[in-house]
Amino acid sequence: MELMKLEIVTPNGVIFDDDVKQVTLPGSEGEFGVLPKHATLVSLLDTGVIVIEKADGSEVAVAINSGYVKVDEEKTTCIVDGAVALSGEDSDLAKALEEAKELIKKAESSSVAIASAVSKVEQIGKSF
C-alpha cells in the first residue's frame, strides 16, 4: 500500500502531519483528490472540508477557510488561514463542529461555497 505525507499548516502551527492513503481537497475550481505519486501542482484552496483517508483506512475531516496546496509525488502540503479538525470525543466533536461552522462563515468566499462547506460539516457531525 503506497502512502504519502500530508501536512496541514495554519499560522498557529501544524494541525495534521501523517502518512495517508489519499486526500480530497476543496480547490478553488471544485473538489479534487490526491493519491500517492500525484503529478506536481500548486493550487488555491477554497472554503470547505479536507477529507483525509489515513493509512489504517479511517477518515478524518478538517474544515478550512482558504489557503494553498503544494502537491508532489511523495508529499502534499496545505497552507491555510484557519482550520478546525473534525474528530475526537463526542463533547470535543460538538465544540469542533461549532468552531468549524464559525470559521467557514467568516471566510470571504461565495455564499454557495460557504453553504456547501457548512452542509458538509453538518453531514460529518451526523455521521459520528
Swiss-Prot record:
One example GO MF annotation: proton-transporting ATP synthase activity, rotational mechanism
Under Pfam families, the record lists: ATP-synt_DE_N
Q: Does the keyword Membrane apply?
A: yes
The membrane topology term of the UniProt record is: Peripheral membrane protein
Q: Does the keyword Glycosyltransferase apply?
A: no
Cellular location(s): Cell inner membrane
**Which keywords, in A-to-Z order, does the entry hold?**
ATP synthesis, Cell inner membrane, Cell membrane, CF(1), Hydrogen ion transport, Ion transport, Membrane, Transport
GO cellular component terms, alphabetically, are:
plasma membrane; proton-transporting ATP synthase complex
* Primary role: Produces ATP from ADP in the presence of a proton gradient across the membrane.
* Alphabetized HAMAP family for the sequence: ATP_synth_epsil_bac
Family per record: Belongs to the ATPase epsilon chain family.
Note the PANTHER family from the entry: ATP SYNTHASE DELTA/EPSILON CHAIN, ATP SYNTHASE EPSILON CHAIN, CHLOROPLASTIC
Q: How does it assemble?
A: F-type ATPases have 2 components, CF(1) - the catalytic core - and CF(0) - the membrane proton channel. CF(1) has five subunits: alpha(3), beta(3), gamma(1), delta(1), epsilon(1). CF(0) has three main subunits: a, b and c.
What is the protein's given name? ATP synthase epsilon chain
Upper taxonomic classification of the species?
Bacteria, Pseudomonadati, Campylobacterota, Epsilonproteobacteria, Campylobacterales
Its gene is atpC
